[in-house]
Curated annotation (Swiss-Prot):
<keyword id="KW-0472">Membrane</keyword>
<dbReference type="GO" id="GO:0034599">
    <property type="term" value="P:cellular response to oxidative stress"/>
</dbReference>
<feature type="compositionally biased region" description="Basic and acidic residues">
    <location>
        <begin position="563"/>
        <end position="579"/>
    </location>
</feature>
<feature type="region of interest" description="Disordered">
    <location>
        <begin position="878"/>
        <end position="900"/>
    </location>
</feature>
<keyword id="KW-0808">Transferase</keyword>
<dbReference type="GO" id="GO:0000422">
    <property type="term" value="P:autophagy of mitochondrion"/>
</dbReference>
<dbReference type="InterPro" id="IPR045269">
    <property type="entry name" value="Atg1-like"/>
</dbReference>
<dbReference type="InterPro" id="IPR017441">
    <property type="entry name" value="Protein_kinase_ATP_BS"/>
</dbReference>
<dbReference type="GO" id="GO:0010506">
    <property type="term" value="P:regulation of autophagy"/>
</dbReference>
<feature type="compositionally biased region" description="Basic and acidic residues">
    <location>
        <begin position="477"/>
        <end position="489"/>
    </location>
</feature>
<dbReference type="GO" id="GO:0005829">
    <property type="term" value="C:cytosol"/>
</dbReference>
<feature type="binding site">
    <location>
        <position position="59"/>
    </location>
    <ligand>
        <name>ATP</name>
    </ligand>
</feature>
<feature type="active site" description="Proton acceptor">
    <location>
        <position position="174"/>
    </location>
</feature>
<keyword id="KW-0653">Protein transport</keyword>
<dbReference type="Pfam" id="PF21127">
    <property type="entry name" value="ATG1-like_MIT2"/>
</dbReference>
<dbReference type="GO" id="GO:0034727">
    <property type="term" value="P:piecemeal microautophagy of the nucleus"/>
</dbReference>
<dbReference type="GO" id="GO:0004674">
    <property type="term" value="F:protein serine/threonine kinase activity"/>
</dbReference>
Length: 1007
């Protein structure tokens, strides 16, 4: 979860301007100096060897903040690093324990990481440390990343480290540019050009095994997720950084060491092109993009990289491991084995083979020397001998302000993007800070006596001619640029957490969804079945009743404000199954109106006149509603005799009903949580304008949208509890499906030619896939909100009620990560949902009386009903075979007892739910409407009905004056007379809005 993120922390010149230098602190043979990076669990400092005055990086981990899993990862990292001694792997120099901290002393990599080197490639010529490099090997230009010579150099060194790991059956599992650290060229140490001289654990610590000594040296870092995995074994833990994660890991499948090769392919592509091959807002969308790409790796038209590199990238970026090249083929590829082409005359390759194999552990390596003994003594606490000597060089430390960045968990403390040349005069640590030097060289202060070598013009001219003769027109594409900006902004938010760790529950849910999706018995006749992790198969026309613009879910679409085409999916099936369609029933007309309204329930036309904090909507316009798959209009619940859902339902239909009801409730809660989430995240650059008329669409003033710390805490708490509630409902939905599937698997009943059972199975499978995708999405967002909350709480004054020290443990939310999340005692999902339901209904009722936005009134009423049903979900657990009458009887008994032991919100919702069910089924005894009204009479001020009461009594507002209208009028008048205030209007007022727009269902001749 960000603890083991070294690469972004080796940038000592990039300090916050409001942070003072930390006091020096002795740690063994080292002195800890200024802080250079901070994460959720660790702080990284610059350090210096006390005797030699050479530099190290010291990572101080606070053990009290770590969960058991993170402690295991830390112990694993220490254990692995103690065994790894290779020039292209960051070495662990020493380890010191205290009562509350572990201090890891690591090799210092002065040039930062490869990510910032790539991002700052256009400013490298401004630094004396890379000026010569860029003069010899200039950047190819637009549509490209680094010069191919530099790309091949870094790839050879990375491959050398990977071969070393493979010889020891180790997989890294988190290879990415941020974990590839760079050191100044080894030749710069010999010439005395490098100011920041790192501590050397051995003679060859900074002597490359392959590549060029005149170019920066690459080292693989961050072994927090590494593990031993023999060639015949498979792993199944999802961990690492999503953007560079292999598809098999994203799909929660077992994987082997080939997962590292995919990551190498993504890194190689980014070095060549300047961006990752697949970019998405979260790991769910990422796997969709990878699968939709179908191994067709394309390159920008202006990119002139060689065909050998393209072939290697395409061989590495195969989404199926069986199709991906193996390690033997990879290590034997000519890009790694042949000399680097295009070198200048004075950059002769090293004498070693470019892919110099490293010996196996027992084959007598270079480490069987006194140096190794010294290293082992140091790791065990012994006194370290003096390191290998360097040429005399002026060693001075310069402190530079780190640009202010949004407060985010385990963020990268890299360059602000526009680096400047280092100062001419070195200054002591206490001097005034200077501006940051170039991105990749942020930790290296400038040297006054730096010697510039004359640039070689041959390669420069060759590169320019190659670019000029490419024949590609230099056409600006503002549309693509804007799209990239929005995608990048969304990506920065989504990947603010550097790692994804999925708990066991999520893995189980995804495994069950996969089992159901790929079971042969579920495949036959599956109309409109979803593809893996998709809303609908690409190019598949939606079934009747679905939006023709269906598209896969965008988990964080709301960031950029783009319209969600798939949010227009109708929800008729959800209500067809609940309400009968008998032409002889008054309630069937009401259900028909509900069905008509449900099509707009979460569509783009949603416009209830509602506001919340900062003007958010509930639900927001742009999120993926349930169901997110094309579905036919046929209802499994409606029988030929027009009967209603009841005891006569078969098990399949009852399961479908319960499953879709639970999923729909989770969707409503999710929509409410999205309102809070939307206010916590910054908009993309091109989405500064919100929806028309939305009070919350003001320009964002800062990364937090101009929110105060108090507001961030409040919104984070509310979003978190709502997301947790949505997760519980989604988990319950999956449990319902799992019980059904277990029963079906035992009985093998799906194998028979039963049309109803097959349709039910397909429908359940569709819902399960939707639930799986939504669960993964909500889990991702809940973790983001959790980190946001934890960080915001720490920024509060110590006497603030929401400060962690002032919150009791009893109000904590269990967290499977580092520590419990503590929320304010008065923030609960049920309270928020109850108040929101009343608010929506109250405003809708006023609009209904005045005749404004009747369609929005219907939507608000139905949404509020679902929200109250979600509150009741923990009380009335719906299981297959359980009758609805028992639930209503329980609700009535609770009300008759006066609800002594239950909150008033639950009493009201129970009464309302039972009475609402009685309206659907008038033949069954129900709760009188006045019982529901009495529950809130003492809380809500009455608002008297005016002319509409008389209008309804006389039938003037009803389009049907026949017997059906009379039945509807009877129900409506009874409810309106018994409910003279709007609090219980969910169960009375909405009927009148439907009655004003209902057409006769049976053409009685009076309409």
């Amino acid at each position: 979860m960000g603890l083991f993120h070294h690469s972004t922390l080796f940038l000592p010149l990039l300090r916050r301007s409001n942070e003072g230098p930390h006091g020096e602190m002795p740690i063994g043979h080292y002195t800890r100096l200024s802080e250079i990076g901070r994460g959720s669990f660790a702080v990284v400092y610059k350090g210096v060897h006390t005797r030699s005055r050479t530099y190290v990086a010291i990572k101080s981990v606070t053990m009290t903040k770590l969960s058991r899993k993170l402690k295991e990862n830390l112990a694993s990292e220490i254990s692995i690093l103690k065994q790894l001694h290779h020039p292209h792997i960051v070495a662990l120099l020493d380890c010191h324990d205290t009562t509350s901290n572990i201090h890891l002393v690591m090799e210092f990599c002065a040039l930062g990481d490869l990510s910032h080197f790539i991002k700052g490639r256009n400013t490298l010529q401004d630094s004396p440390y890379t000026r010569e490099l860029i003069a010899k090997y200039p950047n190819p230009g637009e549509g490209a990343g680094l010069n191919e010579v530099i790309v091949r150099h870094f790839l050879k060194q990375l491959s050398s480290a990977l071969r070393f790991l493979r010889d020891r059956d180790l997989i890294h599992r988190d290879i990415k540019p941020q974990n590839l650290l760079l050191c100044p060229a080894p030749s710069s140490y010999r010439s005395g050009a490098a100011d920041v001289v790192p501590f050397k654990s051995s003679e060859d610590s900074f002597s490359p095994k392959t590549g060029l000594e005149s170019l920066p040296m690459l080292k693989l870092a961050d072994f927090g997720f590494a593990r031993s995995l023999p060639a015949t074994s498979l792993a199944e833990t999802l961990c690492g950084s999503p953007l560079y994660m292999a598809p098999e890991i994203l799909r929660y499948e077992k994987y082997d060491a080939k997962a590292d090769l995919w990551s190498v392919g993504t890194v190689l592509y980014e070095m060549v092109v300047g961006r990752a091959p697949f970019r998405a807002v979260n790991h769910i969308e990422l796997i969709k993009k990878i699968e939709q790409n179908k191994d067709q790796i394309s390159f920008p038209s202006k990119n002139r990289v060689s065909e050998d590199i393209r072939e290697l990238i395409r061989g590495l970026l195969k989404q199926h491991p069986m199709d991906r090249m193996n390690f033997d083929v990879y290590f034997a590829h000519k890009v790694l084995t042949e000399p680097i082409p295009g070198l200048v005359a004075d950059d002769a390759p090293l004498g070693r083979s470019p892919a110099d194999p490293t010996p196996r552990p027992g084959s007598g390596s270079r480490r069987s020397t006194p140096v190794q003994m010294k290293r082992e003594n140091a790791l065990s606490g012994g006194v370290r001998d003096e390191p290998a000597t360097y040429p005399a060089a002026q060693r001075a430390m310069t402190q530079s302000p780190r640009p202010e960045t949004p407060s985010t968990p385990m963020r990268r403390t890299g360059s602000a993007g526009t680096p400047h040349a280092a100062p001419n005069e070195p200054t002591p640590p206490a001097s005034h800070p200077t501006r940051p030097s170039p991105v990749s060289l942020a930790t290296a202060p400038g040297r006054q006596e730096h010697v510039d070598r004359p640039p070689t013009t041959t390669v420069v001219e060759q590169q320019r001619r190659r670019t000029a003769s490419s024949g590609v027109p230099q056409v600006d594409k503002p549309v693509e640029k804007a799209k990239d900006e929005k995608e990048h902004a969304a990506q920065e938010v989504a990947f603010e957490r550097d790692y994804v760790l999925v708990e066991k529950r999520a893995v189980e849910m995804n495994a069950f969804a996969d089992e159901l999706a790929y079971n042969p018995r579920m495949q036959g006749g599956q109309a409109g079945a979803v593809s893996r992790r998709s809303g609908a198969a690409p190019g598949t026309p939606p079934a009747g009743g679905s939006s023709p613009h269906a598209s896969p879910s965008k988990a964080m679409q709301i960031i950029s404000g783009r319209s969600r085409a798939d949010s227009a999916h109708v929800r008729q099936n959800s209500y067809d199954r609940r309400y009968g369609q008998s032409p002889t029933s008054a309630t069937s007309a009401i259900s028909k109106a509900l069905n008509m309204a449900s099509g707009r329930l979460f569509g783009m036309s949603f416009s209830p006149p509602l506001t919340i904090t900062k003007g958010g909507r509930s639900p927001p316009l742009a999120y993926n509603p349930f169901p997110a798959y094309p579905s036919a209009q046929t209802s499994l619940i409606v029988h030929a005799d027009g009967g209603k859902p009841g005891a006569n339902l078969d098990e399949d239909s009852k399961t479908v009903h319960d499953l879709e009801e639970c999923a729909t409730r989770s969707d409503v809660v999710y929509g409410f949580a999205e309102v809070k989430y939307k206010q916590l995240i910054p908009l993309a650059p091109s989405a500064a304008t919100g929806y028309p008329g939305d009070p919350g669409s003001d320009a964002v003033d800062s990364a937090d949208g101009g929110l105060t710390v108090d507001a961030i805490v409040t919104l984070s708490e509310e979003a978190l509890v709502l997301y947790v509630k949505a997760l519980s409902l989604l988990a319950k939905s999956m449990d319902i499906a799992r019980v059904w599937w277990t029963r079906k698997s035992r009985g093998d009943t799906l194998s028979r030619a039963d049309t109803g059972s097959t349709v039910a199975g397909n429908r359940i499978n569709n819902v399960v896939q939707w639930v799986r995708n939504r669960f993964n999405e909500v889990l991702e967002k809940a973790e983001f909100v959790r980190l946001k909350l934890v960080e915001a709480q720490k920024r509060l004054p110590s006497d603030h009620p929401s400060h962690p020290s002032n919150l009791s443990v009893g109000s904590s939310l269990g967290s499977g990560t580092s520590a419990d999340v503590v929320v304010s005692p008065d923030v609960t999902a049920e309270k928020l949902m109850y108040e929101r339901a009343l608010e929506m209904s109250r405003v809708a009722a006023i609009n209904e009386i005045t005749g404004e936005d009747l369609a929005g009134c219907e939507i608000s009423y139905v949404t509020a009903i679902r929200m109250l049903e979600a509150i009741l979900d923990d009380v009335e657990v719906s299981r297959p075979g359980q009758s609805g009458g028992a639930d209503r009887a329980d609700a009535r008994r609770d009300n008759e007892d006066g609800g002594q032991n239950e909150p008033q919100a639950v009493i009201l919702a129970k009464s309302a739910n039972a009475w609402h069910s009685d309206i659907e089924n008038p033949e069954s005894p129900g709760v009188a409407p006045e019982e529901a009204g009495a529950a809130v009479e003492s809380v809500h001020a009455p608002v008297q009905w005016t002319g509409q009461n008389a209008a309804v009594e006389s039938g003037a507002s009803l389009p049907c004056s026949g017997s059906h209208a009379a039945e509807i009028r009877t129900l409506t008048v009874r409810s309106m007379q018994d409910h003279a205030h709007f609090a219980p209007l969910l169960f009375s007022i909405f009927i009148s809005s439907y009655s004003s727009s209902i057409s006769c269902p049976s053409s009685c001749g009076h309409c």
